[in-house]
Amino acid sequence: MSEKENNFPPLPKFIPVKPCFYQNFSDEIPVEHQVLVKRIYRLWMFYCATLGVNLIACLAWWIGGGSGTNFGLAFVWLLLFTPCGYVCWFRPVYKAFRADSSFNFMAFFFIFGAQFVLTVIQAIGFSGWGACGWLSAIGFFQYSPGAAVVMLLPAIMFSVSAAMMAIAIMKVHRIYRGAGGSFQKAQTEWNTGTWRNPPSREAQYNNFSGNSLPEYPTVPSYPGSGQWP
């Protein structure tokens, strides 16, 4: 089988940088899990959009008299969490469902759980964190109502993101436990090194089944009647 060519992120041809990952839901993810994995992918996209809206809201916050530190941090969060979210929690869950990998499931639970906690903090909106959450938006109405209205939008989006993350992690955990996943399996994958690039379920099946017999088995040759002992 020829090696699959990377297709994500889909970059224009004039850019001298090639895609880093191969992503094809219908080709690599089992049919019964494709909807869930696609929803987690869209959740990553929604969270990236939330960070972009948050950057604009932090600019309005700054213009309205708030601290410029929030705008600077919002810019850092956008640049940092957009690629890191894809690599650190979406790719693990993608590979986990692609290959039924306990190690990647564990990595997803740990990193995505931390992402969920961070998103809840962003939704709350502590000042100086670079996130326009509920506390910062509501508290700014007394200084600049117009800017505060803009700040409410990322507060809502962060809240929706946190709610969807909670639902996603519960659904993935239910599937993981129902399929017999365990920490021991994750340790085995770590010790054998298969966690780096676990083979797809199809590849595992082909390796397991293989060709136990030649396509045209040889007909046994028995001795003639006069040659029996």
From Swiss-Prot:
Major subcellular site: membrane
Topological domain spans for side Cytoplasmic: 1-39, 170-229
Annotated spans, Disordered: 208-229
Residue numbers bearing the Phosphothreonine modification: 194
Superkingdom of source: Eukaryota
Membrane topology according to the record: Multi-pass membrane protein
GO cellular component assignments: recycling endosome membrane; trans-Golgi network membrane
Keyword annotations of the record: Membrane, Phosphoprotein, Protein transport, Transmembrane, Transmembrane helix, Transport
InterPro entries hit by this protein: SCAMP
Residues passing through the membrane, by range: 40-60, 61-81, 105-125, 149-169
Keyword Transcription: no
Location(s), subcellular: Membrane
Transmembrane as UniProt keyword: yes
GO BP: protein transport
Family: Belongs to the SCAMP family.
Function of the protein: Probably involved in membrane protein trafficking.
Protein name, UniProt field: Secretory carrier-associated membrane protein 4
Lineage: Eukaryota, Metazoa, Chordata, Craniata, Vertebrata
